[in-house]
A protein has these predicted regions:
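Conserved class I S-adenosyl-L-methionine
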Residues: 1-55, 154-176
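A short SAM/SAH-binding and catalytic strip from SAM-dependent methyltransferases
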Residues: 124-137
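Short alpha-helix
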Residues: 180-197
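A C-terminal cap/extension of S-adenosyl-L-methionine-dependent methyltransferases
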Residues: 205-256
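A short acidic, Gly/Pro-enriched loop at the edge of an enzyme's catalytic core
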Residues: 113-124
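Class I SAM-dependent methyltransferase SAM/SAH-binding core
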Residues: 61, 67-114
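A short glycine-rich, Lys/Arg-flanked "PGG" loop and its adjoining helix->strand segment in the class I
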Residues: 138-149
Length: 256
């Protein structure tokens, strides 16, 4: 585990550079992304966000943009997109993805705790599984710094507490960086110290079983996720304490 921020950043950069270049890992991530992390209008995680937002003409940041897949989606919705990532290789992929589509998105290599953007630049900040890799207090301050007054940030993040997911994490330590830590509700609430007000949606209690549905094809797997997540939402309403056993969250942070 890192003892300094510089060590942490090195761990993160080296891990994600290596992961992206491993064909098997890429296939595993792609299957999981299509089934569980569906970012389209019909996805249970991001679908409600797209219904609530009109991104046309908005200036947005893809925080921890990776290879740019989510950035492309944001640009397709009419946003002026900027992205940052610690990995030079992934940023090169993101730039290529934008160039192929003539999107005009801009990408920068660097530390997410200290981005190159001026204060109050962005209407919205988006991130997918990035916060739990960072020093949260610094990350929250940076997100608040670059957001316009009244701006919002949306992050999809893993939670700690799902028994099956925790077992998988324990059994496969090499699939994660040594410094990452899934979020808990205290970590989410700690954003208030940076002037951000959080609102959290929890997902995937029973829906983790949808991975088995992938054996019948991705379409069946995605349909299984929607069905099981609908059940999960009913369970969360009936017994709110079950939210502590959810696998994933989508967190909306509003700048005060």
């Amino acid at each position: 585990m890192a003892t300094t921020l510089a060590e942490r950043l090195t761990h993160e950069r080296d891990f994600h550079d290596r992961l992206e270049r491993e064909p098997l890992s890429y296939q595993m991530v792609r299957i999981a992304s299509e089934i569980f992390y569906n970012k389209d209008d019909d996805g249970v995680l991001w679908g409600p966000v797209w219904k609530a937002l009109d991104l046309r003409g908005k200036v947005v940041l893809d925080y921890g943009c990776g290879s740019g897949g989510f950035s492309v989606r944001l640009a397709a919705r009419g946003a002026r997109v900027y992205g940052n990532d610690i990995s030079e290789y992934l940023v090169s992929q993101a730039r290529a993805a934008s160039a192929r589509r003539n999107l005009g998105a801009e990408f920068y290599v660097g530390d997410a705790h200290h981005t190159p953007f001026p204060p109050a630049m962005f209407d919205y900040v988006f991130g997918n599984g990035i916060l739990h890799h960072l020093e949260l207090d610094r990350a929250y301050r940076e997100v608040a710094r670059v957001l316009k007054p009244g701006g919002k940030a949306f992050f999809m993040e893993p939670l700690i507490g799902h028994p099956l997911v925790e077992a998988v994490r324990w059994a496969t330590p090499g699939r994660r960086t040594v410094d990452e830590k899934p979020m808990d509700f205290a970590a989410i609430e700690s954003s208030r110290a940076a002037g951000l007000v959080p609102a959290c949606r929890t997902h995937y209690l029973t829906a983790v079983a949808a991975l088995a549905g992938a054996a019948f094809g991705r379409s069946f797997g995605k349909a299984s996720v929607r069905t099981l997540d609908a059940l999960d939402q009913k369970l969360f309403r009936m017994a709110p304490s079950l939210k502590k056993k959810a696998w994933l969250s989508v967190i909306e942070y509003s700048k005060t």
